Amino acid sequence: MGEVQREKVAVIIGPTAVGKTKLSIDLAKALNGEIISGDSMQIYRTMDIGTAKVTKEEMDGIPHYMVDIKNPEESFSVAEFQERVRKHIREITERGKLPIIVGGTGLYIQSVLFDYQFTDDAGDAIYREQMEKLALERGVEYVHKKLQEVDPESAERIHANNVRRVIRALEIFHTTGEKMSDQLEKQENELLYDVSLIGLTMDREMLYDRINLRVDIMMDQGLLEEVEGLYNRGIRDCQSIQAIGYKEIYDYFEDRVSLEEAVSQLKTNSRRYAKRQLTWFRNKMDVTWFDVTDGEKTSEILRYIEGKLQRKSNNSK
């Protein structure tokens, strides 16, 4: 009975710059869908260029959710993402449309699809403040090494610059004696939705070339001015500016590096992030992959999703 009632959801994942945005809009048009961003940084207003946020023109009339919902000064948690996205899925389904989640933030997407439970029970404000102080005084790498010692799986998954999540993982271990990675693993067994989960991949060198080109285009589009606007507003030590594309340019404004060095580091970090994204998706999710090295596979992907949706409809009768 539970199988019959599960809502249908299409999910498009893949590394940065692989072509998810265009595909998602093409599929939404063909499948009567509406799009939910699965990117943890596109939620922030005024951070458009550096997050490669979909433009109004690109949307082409397709409704998009989880974009521009927070100010850069505000924090945002996986738990809040989960709650909001599940609400959007219900509402889109009730309108007779297909929810299509698109993005590259693995943990966020996973938290929606699986029965992840987020509670405030495992919290210790004093310990958290101690870790935050350590991160400020001794650097984020020091705190990340502490996480490596107690929960290497989470340390592998969470980048050192994502200080909030590093400290949260340490806090969970400190208060419960249980690794965050173990808690998540327990909850990874059952999908809450009828999911068509597809991934885009391509030849690594081609992907890296696309990433480098994308950074050059971002600079031409005004990324420097976009980050300068945030910097001049006094935004410091916020979750938003830990994003790739912002922290590197911040280093330039704080006279740590030249602009050329900042752009070079941005390209390097973007390539590394793409590699981590692919590793995460391949290790954590049962994905049907489509290689788009030789061009887009929209028709093939559409046939796959339509076939899967049709089989599910027949099975529910």
UniProtKB/Swiss-Prot annotation:
Keyword Manganese tagged: no
Gene this chain is encoded by: miaA
Region (Interaction with substrate tRNA): 39-42
Pfam families: IPPT (PF01715)
Organismal lineage: Bacteria, Bacillati, Bacillota, Bacilli, Bacillales
Known function: Catalyzes the transfer of a dimethylallyl group onto the adenine at position 37 in tRNAs that read codons beginning with uridine, leading to the formation of N6-(dimethylallyl)adenosine (i(6)A).
Subunit note: Monomer.
SUPFAM superfamilies registered for this protein in UniProt: P-loop containing nucleoside triphosphate hydrolases (SSF52540)
Name of the molecule in the record: tRNA dimethylallyltransferase
Binding site for substrate: 16-21
InterPro entries: Dimethylallyltransferase, IPT, P-loop_NTPase
Recorded GO MF terms: ATP binding; tRNA dimethylallyltransferase activity
